[in-house]
């Protein structure tokens, strides 16, 4: 069935909230929210193959290592595997003193009782219960009116409160979710939540969590922010309530919705690492946290070795992280475009290690999350001189002069077009060697001897000319002038650069010569040797042979 020409026949737009005095657009997020990971519950239940106990334990320990202080560990009343895992966490002493586990239950007495059985002996625990409140769920799924939905929430709350009072050895926390909050009438969502608040009687010292899920993301992020601000204004005992967000990514804006929800007054965010979860996934806690970090706000979570975290998540979930996933994807710190590479290279050159991060195209320093700079610039047919120069400089210490960068980039471009593939730094270096360092036709340097006296240099060189050994001798003010004087062709040195590669006793010299032969366009040569004079002589021969090769090609054409 094709898409409709008039989708309004089938789909209804969301109804905007009348909130003309909204204040959230003028706010900024200047502190981290409370975080809850639901990887082991919402994330796990969405997997094709849910995690076994060993994977769950590995994931749990990773979450603790990252710094999560509240972790939803399962749905023990719905799964024996989850029940057993909760018991192992408690009985095995795996829960640090500063970490609180959370479990989910439906609003049914038998399931709530089973949930409390799973938590027996826990030092701290949050019991999270829910029931759906949206009109379509009331009508289609549960056949309940508003009063019926509210009665379910209140009755379940009373059961939870009673069972918690019977187990005073545990420090209890409570959370209620009006499921599908984002599609529920705002006044009714507040009405139900206020009835739950009345049951639990929270105080500023012992707050109740009211979690407001965008169970199915159905509107723009600003609409969700309006819902949150309206809720915060109208809920009872606001100072005794933690307003929690639980966004999904059905429209692709879960992160934005959570950020605007925090601006609208929420205190807490539930989500999964790298956005796992039902359908299109829960909000990605990593992206949210690192968005804060790159705004100068400490997120309270540690992703210093983000690839190690990713490895655990991928292996436990059996799902890959997308190469373009923010912050962690294989390609997110990579530039192929020539103009991007040039800007990044210049940014790195000017970046103060102790200063504000200002490298173009990189919103975060890859080193902060355990990434190297090796993959920042990669070369394909779209790349330019900046990226090529950066790779040679970073990997091999070779700093090509600017005009030589332009010249060599054309060589690389031709090769990438031929291959149709990306070129690695090693392949680029091999191409540089073939083009410049092994340019030994028609003249291959065999050896040289230099004598200096009274400011004059006498240079003797031995060369192979088409397989025959020849001796040339030249006089000049320096080695290069002496070499030019003895060449059998007329050349002009247009430019010269040199620098050291490495340091100490193992340092080598790199010399670059731009040379013009008989009025042709100039070409470059490169020489590398432990001795600077030898490197310079090699560079001149490199340029000369390339120029003679070009001349021969022109004549042949």
Curated annotation (Swiss-Prot):
Positions annotated to bind Mg(2+): 42, 246, 248, 282
One Pfam family cited in the UniProt record for this chain: IPMS_D2
InterPro entries (UniProt xref): 2-isopropylmalate_synth_dimer (IPR013709), AIPM/Hcit_synth_CS (IPR002034), Aldolase_TIM (IPR013785), IPM_Synthase (IPR005668), LeuA-like_post-cat (IPR054692), LeuA_allosteric_dom_sf (IPR036230), LeuA_N_DRE-TIM (IPR039371), PYR_CT (IPR000891)
Subcellular localization: Cytoplasm
Keywords: Amino-acid biosynthesis, Branched-chain amino acid biosynthesis, Cytoplasm, Leucine biosynthesis, Magnesium, Metal-binding, Transferase
First-tier enzyme category under EC: transferase
Alphabetized Gene3D superfamilies for the sequence: 3.30.160.270, Aldolase class I
Cofactor(s) recorded in Swiss-Prot or TrEMBL: Mg(2+)
Protein function: Catalyzes the condensation of the acetyl group of acetyl-CoA with 3-methyl-2-oxobutanoate (2-ketoisovalerate) to form 3-carboxy-3-hydroxy-4-methylpentanoate (2-isopropylmalate).
Oligomeric form and interacting partners: Homodimer.
Name of the protein in its database record: 2-isopropylmalate synthase
Gene name for this UniProt entry: leuA
